[in-house]
Amino acid sequence: AGFSQEVVALLPADPTASADAVMRTVADIAKVVRGDGGGGRRSFSTGVSRPITSVGGLPAAYAEARKAVHVGRQMHGESALTHFDALGIYRLLALIPDGGDLRRFVDESLGELATDDSPENEDLRRTLSVLIDTNINVAETARQLFFHYNTLRYRIAKLERMLGPFTTDAQLRLTLALALRIHQMRGI
């Protein structure tokens, strides 16, 4: 592989260091390379692999770092700093070569909520996302979104009219959660 647009850095890591400590170190290095306020330099993304213990692990670590860069850009834009272990489900989604398939899945699953042409759709997607993230805990969702409990109950009823009974159908909830994650990916 050519490195015309890549810089590969190997950093010694304490095997007992937490992933957070490693990411702080890498973020500090990226900040220095980027310069204050970017300094007019091109933006760049940084991918971090899992630690390796021998030179034999370099090819796999390189592949992990590249995957972290690729998926990190889709999720966070051109200046992403992403650890391979933080990719989660996005690691699998990135394996789907046809973005059109992902877009169709989002459109079919979210219906009119898939469009970005309305602030109301964005608001309802956010409500749905927090509901799913809190495992349909209405009180916690209302607290996180600063809604009155009854306002949230109204929104849930509206969402269920649009999407189906996601509060009682775990399979539908999984489909919607996946569609929301795909919707967040750039270029989809």
For every predicted segment, state its role.
Residues 1-188:
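Cytosolic nucleotide-utilizing catalytic cores of signal-transduction proteins
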